[in-house]
A protein has these predicted regions:
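Outer-membrane beta-barrel translocator domains and adjoining extracellular loop/strand segments
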Residues: 37-43, 91-94, 121-128, 170-179, ...
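Extracellular loop and loop/strand-boundary signature of outer-membrane beta-barrel proteins
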Residues: 45-49, 82-86, 127-132, 177-182
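Residues on the lipid-exposed face of transmembrane beta-strands in outer-membrane beta-barrel proteins
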Residues: 58-66, 98-104, 111, 142-148, ...
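Residues that define the transmembrane beta-barrel architecture of outer-membrane proteins
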Residues: 52-60, 91-96, 135-142, 186-192
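Signature for the C-terminal beta-barrel architecture of outer-membrane proteins
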Residues: 147-219
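Transmembrane beta-strand segments of Gram-negative outer membrane beta-barrel proteins
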Residues: 20-60, 69-83
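Short loop/turn motifs that connect adjacent beta-strands in outer-membrane beta-barrel proteins
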Residues: 21-23, 66-79, 103-107, 149-160, ...
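Transmembrane beta-barrel strands of outer-membrane/channel proteins
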Residues: 24-36, 75-85, 102, 109-115, ...
Length: 219
């Protein structure tokens, strides 16, 4: 235990720099039920940290934001130790989030797995859209694009991104489906989206229109 504490102390000591911000965190959660399964809304929108079985978990990690010249960087590592998350009574340790996000002016470059919700929706109230929700663990991917609205005209802004990634559920499918049944391994992931915004910046009324595409391929 001494080594992690010492390392954390060193990182926190360096967070006093004007351009750096360190954010350590720890979280504990548990869900129990008396019926056949956990109620739907106690499982939904949990970014994969929910289960129809009784479950408990502890998670912790470290976020780091800093600047390097005109570049802005954000890194994060988030790990989870859980019981009953995938199968009844099973024990698992996994990485929930691990990513680096780099921004230069309007350009964004991202690599890793990060929790995200559906665009244009209030993810605290919604169960997701037709292609994306907050019900599964993040998908590792590499992305490039314009992550925030960029005004190209006084009342017209654009944003968009494209990414490629891969699913990490091979072992889950092997245990869930079992031998003698068909299932696909090593599936790849592709995402792209584009949006336009019409309206006065920071005005009371703005119109957002766009399209998203999420696909599976390979395997």
């Amino acid at each position: 235990m001494r080594i992690p504490i010492c390392l954390l102390a060193i990182i926190l000591a360096g967070s006093g720099m004007a351009t750096a911000q360190v954010s350590p965190f720890v979280e504990y959660g548990a869900t129990v039920h008396t019926g056949d399964n956990i109620p739907l809304w106690q499982v939904s929108n949990q970014q994969g940290l929910g289960s129809i079985y009784d479950n408990t978990y502890i998670r912790g990690g470290l976020g780091y934001k800093h600047r390097l010249g005109k570049w802005k960087f954000e890194e994060k590592l988030d790990m989870v130790a859980a019981v009953g998350m995938n199968f009844k009574g099973d024990k698992d340790i996994f990485i929930q989030q691990a990513y680096i996000d780099a921004r230069y002016k309007w350009l964004g470059i991202f690599a890793g797995s990060r929790e995200k919700g559906a665009p244009l929706l209030n993810n605290a109230l919604s169960s997701g859209d037709m292609t994306w929700s907050g019900n599964a663990r993040p998908i590792p991917q590499i992305m490039i694009g314009i992550p925030e609205y960029l005004y190209v005209l006084p009342r017209f802004a654009i944003k968009g991104e494209i990414s490629y990634g891969w699913f990490t559920d091979n072992k889950y499918q092997e245990r869930k489906v079992g031998a003698g049944h068909w299932y696909t391994k090593d599936i790849k992931y592709h995402h792209k989206e584009g949006f336009v915004r019409v309206g006065v910046p920071n005005g009371k009324w703005q119109l957002d229109i766009g399209m998203t595409l999420d696909t599976q391929f390979g395997g």
